[in-house]
Amino acid sequence: MKNRTAMYDFTIIVPVYNEEDNIQAIEQQLAGYLPHALRPACVLFVNDGSTDKSLSLIEEVCRRRPDFLYITLARNGGLSAAIKAGIDVTQSPLVGYMDADLQTTAEDFNLLLRDIDDHSLVTGIRANRKDTGFKRLQSKIANGFRRMMTHDGAEDTGCPLKVLHTSYAKRMPFFTGMHRFLPALILLQNGTFRQVPVRHFPRTAGVSKYHLWNRLVSPFIDCLAYRWMKKRYINYSIAGSNLNER
């Protein structure tokens, strides 16, 4: 059964977990972007089991803005689960996502959309990151280890601004932490990706949901899971069939 995302070319997934202080700003930014998006676009909030007022605020936004949609998960499953849930229900040809912390801007989706016809995935690279030096160091170490383990060549998989062809996104094997491996998972499907510099801003409201464990230690464990999965990944293409013959 088709849903309202099928009416658009591009669905922007916004995972939300306890971001009540940011919902109004997210609405304003995305509402300002949609009229001049390079592709007809909608917004899909994924409420990841928030325990604050995020869900009620999202429902209010979606009631007054027809291009804003939402799903809500029964419990908090983490960023990868929220992204997967959004991709699973998306029926537009293109899908992307951004974080609810507004450290990236929706305006930069147009930088990614310019190249999406030529690639399976276009991902941002955070230029002039506004995080603390300790956070940048953690990301540098985690990205270096991931590149060594995956050989994907991606510089900044933690950048929360990405656009994919939905057909590729739906075929990707998902696991906890998979959002760190999108370029590698695209390469497993014989796809291609491009990296584009995007702007980065300091967080102005709410609190980070990440700490030393899930910014540094968890990615190391996820790399081992990826290597195990890669050895067992099944990739095929159908050369012919009679499914459509009468």
Summary of predicted features, one role per range:
Residues S50, R75, K130, F134, ...:
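Residue-level signature of the cytosolic catalytic core of signaling kinases
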Residues H119-K170, I221-L224:
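Short, flexible, basic/aromatic active-site loop/helix in glycosyltransferases
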Residues D88, K135, K162, H179-R180, ...:
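Residues that recognize and position ribonucleotide moieties
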Residues M1-D131, S167, F193-R194, G240-R246:
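Structured catalytic core of nucleotide-sugar glycosyltransferases
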